[in-house]
Regions:
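C-terminal scaffold of the Radical SAM
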Residues: 1-133
């Protein structure tokens, strides 16, 4: 249904932006790669890439506290996001944001319970992309 809706919106001239998240429960690096392939077929105009964070007061916090979810390390989140970023940009899809905006609400004391948060996450991803294999 989602693929059909995106195609229909594009037919009517809408600019399509997609948001991709790494580190979702049950997600593997292989499933991230498969998602990127689907996104490339959809051909959005732009995309955003975010790592999943455990935020205070959310259902995910309770799942995390019960030990049923382990967030990505910062290193794994950077590597997976760099893969997504490089694939999208090589395909001509503009990536307009990588990582969450480090605002006062998000960065308030105790708001981020766990996960790969870094105020310069996007720069880490771009640096990773520029490293030699």
């Amino acid at each position: 249904m989602f693929i059909r809706l995106v195609s229909l919106l594009k037919q009517y001239g809408f600019e399509i932006g997609l948001q991709l998240m790494v580190g979702m429960p049950g997600q593997s690096f292989d499933s991230v790669k498969a998602t990127v392939e689907q996104v490339l077929r959809l051909g959005p105009s732009f995309a955003r890439i975010y790592p999943l964070l455990v935020i205070k007061g959310t259902p995910l916090e309770h799942i995390y506290e019960r030990g049923e979810f382990e967030p990505l390390t910062l290193e794994a989140a950077v590597e997976q996001s760099a893969y997504v970023y490089s694939k999208l940009t090589l395909a001509g899809i503009k990536v307009i944001r990588v990582g969450l905006q480090a605002d006062e609400e998000l960065c308030g004391e105790g708001n981020i319970v766990a996960g790969p948060f870094h105020p310069s996450f996007g720069e880490l991803v771009q640096s990773f992309c520029s490293m030699p294999n």
